[in-house]
Amino acid sequence: MQNTILKFEKLLNENVNYIPTLNNEVLEAKIPEKWSKKEILGHLIDSAIHNLVRFTEINYLEKPYQHRSYSQMDLVSLNQYQTMDINELTTLWFSVNKQIVRIMKSVDERALDYKIILSNQSIIDLRFLMTDYVEHLEHHINQIKS
């Protein structure tokens, strides 16, 4: 997990000051059926919120943990990320993710093996979910930077 945490912290620290420097026209540019860069950042906020809940709930809820999905498209629209100030968006994204870093750093080694049942009934563990979260974040950060 240490490498995952280091990668995660690097992604946060490299981008917290970079993202707000992007031109608003670039951040808000829309292609039909695609999210703008602002909306991608908003999606990362939704993902962070949901995963923060998952990463904490798994410690006290019945095992195996039942993974609950969420409607990504609806949340991005309902949260109106496209109209938010980029500094506000970036601060929210950074703050929730800093809390996830704290959780990852303090997670019990045994907890990383806790089983999680996905909606398709496949089984993963907390280690995979945390690692996949960082990979997902990196993918979308690369979209914002492109």
Where are each of the predicted segments found?
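Acidic/histidine-rich alpha-helical segments that form the ligand environment
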Residues: 7, 11, 17-21, 76-113
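A structural signal for long alpha-helical coiled-coils and helix-turn connectors
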Residues: 20-23, 59, 108, 145
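An N-terminal domain-cap segment
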Residues: 5, 9, 25-27, 31
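Short, helix-capping/interhelical loops that line the mouth of catalytic, cofactor-
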Residues: 1-6, 51-93
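Generic structural concept
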Residues: 5, 9-12, 41, 45, ...
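Short, contiguous alpha-helical
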Residues: 27-72, 101, 115-146
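Short N-terminal signal/transit or membrane-insertion segments
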Residues: 1-11, 137-146
